[in-house]
């Protein structure tokens, strides 16, 4: 039996949520972690058409790239399109999971796919991933409840180290306490002293998940006042951020003009038209790209002739021209339309692959057209 929590853990193993940007909101957006899953629909983003397809196909989980929920929701009702979509998913017991900038920055994901298409050599991440604060959380829990508390913490992102999930240390010990007269103890009675066989449970947790993990700990722990400690680690967990970065840069197989590079991009990614700034006859040897919206990173460009990305504005093109860098707007959708396939392949290649039916949403398209 595969659960939503199992799939989230596997996705986190491949695309650690710790490596998401601080403003991002990946992870489980809707649904119960213990819900069973045998059908998963992957999509770039959640749309009414994707919701309808998930319901029609009988999916129990929709796995998207773009998180549907970015900001706190004040109301969820059928007065808004967003509310209706979430209600439709909830009423059909369909969970919603997202892997966004944690996927964008991961090795062997979209950056590698686009670099392979361009046949880049001498590759390296265009933007190295900045490490985020890591904490160790230590909680003391009765031996009989240790697994329940551990699973609740894992479900909120604790215990992810590199390519491993559900990582913890457990040691046996003895807890001692005296119950106050106004207490409501799970073990013992008010006014008595108790000695309990307990487990010391330790896990690492990222700064962005710390609040959710401590909340889950409180909810799952049998004690009225759980005893736990949180320590900030002075060194980052090895292997978690050193291989991660946004985009890729590298050398083309052979120098070509900007005009020829544009024609090549249109052909390999099936793009009818695109926008670009720069001298069409200039020679281009080393290029960089950032899938999605990466024009804000022009100032980070060093030693490249052209930057390929999407969602470029007037001032982005002007900035690139001033810096002597060709800027190619290949489109947000066009540079990310392969991600649902990457998500689907990740599921099929996982330990749960034989237990899951995975389908890529058919109703995906660029939200706008060029006339």
Which residues make up each language-model segment?
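Hydrophobic structural segments
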Residues: 1-371
């Amino acid at each position: 039996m595969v659960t939503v929590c199992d799939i989230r853990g596997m996705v986190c193993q491949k695309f650690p949520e710790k490596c998401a940007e601080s403003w991002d909101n990946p992870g489980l957006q809707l649904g119960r972690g213990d819900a069973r899953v045998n059908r998963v629909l992957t999509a770039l983003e959640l749309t009414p058409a994707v919701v309808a397809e998930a319901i029609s196909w009988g999916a129990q989980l929709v796995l998207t790239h773009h998180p549907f929920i970015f900001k706190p929701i004040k109301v969820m009702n059928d007065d808004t399109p967003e509310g209706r979509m979430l209600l439709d998913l909830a009423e059909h017991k369909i969970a919603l999971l997202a892997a966004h900038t944690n996927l964008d920055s991961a090795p062997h994901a979209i950056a590698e796919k686009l670099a392979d298409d361009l046949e880049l050599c001498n590759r390296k991440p265009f933007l190295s991933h900045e490490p985020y604060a890591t904490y160790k959380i230590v909680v003391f829990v009765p031996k009989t409840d240790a697994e329940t508390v551990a699973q609740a913490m894992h479900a909120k992102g604790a215990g992810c180290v590199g390519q491993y999930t559900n990582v913890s240390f457990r040691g046996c010990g003895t807890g001692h306490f005296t119950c106050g007269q106004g207490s409501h103890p799970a073990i013992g009675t008010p006014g008595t002293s108790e000695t309990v066989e307990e487990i010391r449970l330790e896990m690492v947790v990222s700064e962005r998940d710390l609040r959710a993990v401590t909340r889950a700990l409180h909810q799952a722990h049998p004690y009225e006042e759980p005893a736990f400690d949180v320590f900030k680690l002075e060194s980052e967990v090895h292997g978690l951020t050193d291989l991660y970065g946004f985009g890729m840069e590298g050398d083309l197989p052979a120098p070509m003009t900007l005009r020829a590079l544009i024609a090549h991009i249109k052909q390999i990614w099936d793009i009818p038209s695109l926008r670009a700034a720069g001298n069409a006859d200039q020679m281009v040897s080393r290029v960089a790209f950032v899938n999605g919206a990466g024009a804000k990173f022009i100032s980070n460009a060093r030693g490249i002739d052209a930057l390929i990305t999407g969602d470029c504005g007037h001032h982005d093109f002007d900035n690139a021209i001033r810096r002597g860098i060709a800027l190619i707007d290949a489109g947000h959708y066009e540079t990310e339309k392969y991600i649902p396939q990457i998500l689907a392949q990740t599921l099929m290649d996982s330990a749960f692959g034989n237990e899951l039916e995975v389908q890529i949403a058919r109703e995906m398209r660029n939200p706008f057209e060029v006339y």
